[in-house]
Amino acid sequence: MIRILYMGNNLAGLEVLKWLKDRNENIVGLVVHPPEKRKYGEEIIHTSGLPSEFIFSGVEINQTNFLDRMRELKPEIILSIFFHYTLRNELMQIPRLGCLNLHPAYLPYGKGPYPNVWSIVDRTPAGATLHYIDKGIDTGDIIVQKKVIVDFTDTGESLYRKLEKACIELFRENWEAIKKGTNKRISQPASGTYHTLKDVTKIDEIKLDENYEAGYLIDVLRARTFPPHESAYVILSDGRKIYIRVSLEEAQE
């Protein structure tokens, strides 16, 4: 049984870990987000069944003592499932089977955060990708991916749920090939799209004295609709900030 260092957050991180545990896979260490950034963190910790000395925080993964600990644990593969911390090269060199990331985007489109937003705003392909981690952000060789259809009624939230589901399914369907080393490894093209967190803030403010193409404005509003998270907004002349969320429904004939 291969030795797995598991790095996970969010519902996908929980569901993939549950699936691995149900199959009696060998999780030798767990890395979670710090408490203020955790989603499903306590459930992930409980599911791992690991004692506290084998559970680590994402903020320490590139520290020397953590790297020394990983060399002792000897993981053969590192799995990053909706995990938001960047790995140093020294850590990536430890597992013989490499470091894998599950990303809710159809790479090379949607590199970086909020791929659900940018598939709508940029009108680029959406999907799920399982890929190797390299020194770039979501730029490593692709193992496998699947597309997800973006409907005009989708919001940032509904598309995220679809991408989340596709990611979990993609991992389950391909884990055996990864363990056996029979998976494909395809270099990513240099094209595609990449966005930062700051890019989202640039589209969030809708200026009342500017003209927008209707299609673009609708796309921004629906892409940023994901309650209770912040959405697109307007600033009124009296200084009030008003958030805008939309609901789209197909007409019934």
Region roles according to the model:
Residues 1-253:
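One-carbon transfer enzymes
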